[in-house]
Amino acid sequence: MSMQDPIADMFTRIRNGLSAEKEFVSVPFSKIKMEIANFLVNEGYIKSCSKGTTSMGHPSIEIELKYHAGVPVIEMIKRVSRPSLRIYKSHADLPKVYGGYGVAIVSTSKGLVSDRKARDLGVGGEIIGYVA
């Protein structure tokens, strides 16, 4: 059976790993998921990510989760735009997540950027998800 929303699956694996206090989670590889993982590293929500392979030889992304004093750094990670309902916003309409403490992941013509950077660049795009 094929997966309907691979990005939502990635977010769920991260959420489940954090609630189980895992050090690493493994996610099936795709370019967009690798880009999202690198984005989360740059924003400071996860420690690291690297491309690996599963025991079956399939490519995967190994994500090292981040904790501060035993508490997960990621309080909330949520998929917004999904295959059945895409959500696009102009730069003026981009939401502030958790009153500016969180970040919206936006797919723009300039690549994957945060809501703050999209506003600075003056570009809108598809809201991939929210992280706080």
From Swiss-Prot:
Keywords: Ribonucleoprotein, Ribosomal protein, RNA-binding, rRNA-binding. Belongs to the universal ribosomal protein uS8 family. NCBIfam families: PRK00136.1 (NF001109). One of the primary rRNA binding proteins, it binds directly to 16S rRNA central domain where it helps coordinate assembly of the platform of the 30S subunit. GO terms for biological process: translation. The keyword Calcium does not apply. PROSITE patterns: RIBOSOMAL_S8. This is Small ribosomal subunit protein uS8. It holds the Pfam family Ribosomal_S8. One of its GO terms (molecular function) is structural constituent of ribosome. The gene is rpsH.
